[in-house]
């Protein structure tokens, strides 16, 4: 799920907003800014534990409106009016803070890969142009790789062409 339990004993799932996916049994509540600070630290600590265990790097999942970071990035789930919502820069803020924390905890030689959807293929979702901008911001933040896929978990099959679709319907994404 794109939602998370930020702290042990948290009774309700949190998300960017109180908007949940179609498969959620109950609506989440919007994460507080204080919880987001804890989550950023937890990402850094988890990456550091992996590094201490011999790992060379991590992939941070922001694709498919899946996972907490993917939920924050998409306008389909993120309805916040604070610094973690609104325009693309606000919605990207949490991911950039996570990248910064991982770098701080693990150093410059630790590999950071970020997975994004190149296009969510959903009305009102992230577009190719949005994700070109996001990719440039991730590069500025010092990520080593950007893993691009497509679609989202909101509209099942959003990245799968309908039967009878002309060949290579997503070829425009490679230009």
What are these regions (language model features)?
Residues 1-175:
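Flavin-dependent oxidoreductase catalytic cores
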């Amino acid at each position: 799920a794109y939602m998370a339990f930020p702290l042990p004993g948290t009774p309700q799932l949190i998300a960017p907003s109180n908007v949940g996916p179609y498969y959620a049994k109950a609506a989440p509540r919007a994460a507080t800014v204080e919880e987001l600070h804890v989550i950023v630290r937890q990402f850094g600590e988890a990456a550091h534990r992996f590094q201490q265990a011999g790992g060379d790097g991590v992939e941070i999942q922001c694709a498919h409106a899946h996972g907490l970071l993917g939920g924050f990035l998409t306008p389909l789930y993120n309805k916040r009016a604070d610094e973690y919502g609104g325009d693309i820069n606000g919605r990207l803020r949490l991911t950039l803070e996570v990248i910064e924390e991982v770098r701080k905890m693990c150093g410059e030689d630790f590999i950071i890969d970020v997975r994004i959807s190149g296009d969510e293929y959903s009305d009102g979702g992230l577009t190719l142009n949005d994700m070109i901008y996001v990719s440039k911001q991730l590069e500025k933040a010092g990520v080593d790789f950007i893993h691009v896929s497509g679609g989202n978990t909101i509209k099942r099959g959003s990245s799968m062409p309908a039967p009878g679709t002309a060949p290579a319907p997503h070829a425009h994404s490679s230009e």
